[in-house]
């Protein structure tokens, strides 16, 4: 009997209930155990084909999604936007309908979240968000897996995101921790707080799970006693024209040894990568004893295998 995610789109963490987030985490844990037991290929998706569309460059997402598909027995077909007729003006709705006749799922990394929504509206196969300007759900699911592995639980864990609080990673992290009953703090300048609709969705989830949400402008105050300190780049892809303004606003939000010293004694540091050493994080922190970024990056593979299996395996 198909599970609760079978055949569904995944555009946002908002698409998942708390129980479904836990299902992804537990499935990912089992996938990872089997991987390290030597079961590298689990042919649950044998005969399936997955189209991967990239409007933005990618290292972790592209490689981990291709490998995830291959390890599940599926065939990934990877396209840059300029390799498709999208680049010559074909409407997204036409591309979505055509690809649906050839493949079993479409995953896309796009500049505008609206592109994903249009794709999902017209595709007759599941559509998966590999990153948009609004959210990065696959990253957040891998992050939740990482925190669970490192801390043994998530309920009540204090997770502090420091930096640009309205970027895609911050949005998805806020939502996933709220759905899992954690204590999520977003520390950012008032100009860069989370989008109102995302914050309201997180607050609604928190009412059900007992999670707590805080917006704290002062990073030192925010990080005090943190179990997890998380940051991301100050200038997201597509926002390069705002670089000077972002650096001015975020200068005091750098995660350095002084800031980490305010966190709990066993705090961990997380970053979705790529990192700009000397900007949002120092070399000493990302290469230091707090850092779990390489385990976090690996967990993209296991979390995405779980997502693909749950959506595509009947």
Swiss-Prot record:
Protein location: Cytoplasm
Pathway involvement of the protein, from the record: Amino-acid biosynthesis; L-arginine biosynthesis; L-arginine from L-ornithine and carbamoyl phosphate: step 1/3
Single GO cellular component term: cytoplasm
UniProt xrefs under Pfam families: OTCace, OTCace_N
Catalytic activity: carbamoyl phosphate + L-ornithine = L-citrulline + phosphate + H(+)
Keywords for the protein's UniProt record, in alphabetical order: Amino-acid biosynthesis, Arginine biosynthesis, Cytoplasm, Transferase
Keyword Amino-acid biosynthesis: yes
Function: Reversibly catalyzes the transfer of the carbamoyl group from carbamoyl phosphate (CP) to the N(epsilon) atom of ornithine (ORN) to produce L-citrulline.
Protein name: Ornithine carbamoyltransferase
Species for this entry: Hyperthermus butylicus (strain DSM 5456 / JCM 9403 / PLM1-5)
């Amino acid at each position: 009997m198909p599970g609760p995610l079978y055949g569904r789109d995944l555009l946002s963490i908002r698409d998942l209930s708390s129980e479904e987030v836990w299902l992804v985490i537990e499935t990912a844990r089992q996938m990872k155990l089997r991987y390290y037991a030597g079961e590298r290929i689990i042919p649950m998706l044998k005969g399936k084909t997955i189209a991967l569309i990239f409007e933005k460059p990618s290292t972790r997402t592209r490689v981990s999604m291709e490998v995830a598909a291959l390890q599940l027995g599926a065939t990934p077909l990877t396209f840059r936007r300029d390799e498709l007729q999208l680049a010559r003006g074909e409407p997204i709705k036409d591309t979505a309908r055509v690809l649906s006749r050839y493949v079993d799922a479409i995953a896309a990394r796009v500049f505008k979240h609206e592109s994903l929504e249009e794709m999902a509206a017209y595709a007759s196969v599941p559509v998966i968000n590999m990153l948009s300007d609004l959210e990065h759900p696959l990253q957040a699911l891998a992050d939740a897996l990482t925190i669970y592995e490192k801390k043994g639980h998530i309920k009540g864990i204090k997770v502090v995101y420091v930096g640009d609080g309205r970027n895609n990673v911050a949005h998805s992290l806020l939502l996933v921790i709220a759905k899992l009953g954690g204590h999520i703090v977003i520390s950012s300048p008032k100009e860069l707080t989370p989008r109102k609709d995302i914050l309201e969705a997180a607050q609604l989830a928190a009412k059900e799970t007992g999670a707590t949400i805080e917006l704290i402008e002062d990073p030192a105050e925010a990080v005090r006693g943190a179990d997890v300190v998380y940051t991301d780049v100050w200038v997201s892809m597509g926002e390069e024209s705002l670089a000077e303004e972002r650096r001015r606003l975020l200068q005091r939000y750098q995660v350095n040894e002084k800031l980490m010293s305010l966190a709990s004694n066993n705090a961990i540091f997380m970053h979705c990568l790529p990192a700009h050493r000397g900007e949002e994080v120092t070399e000493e922190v990302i290469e230091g004893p707090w850092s779990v970024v390489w385990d976090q990056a690996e967990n993209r593979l296991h979390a995405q295998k779980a997502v693909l299996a749950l959506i595509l395996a009947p």
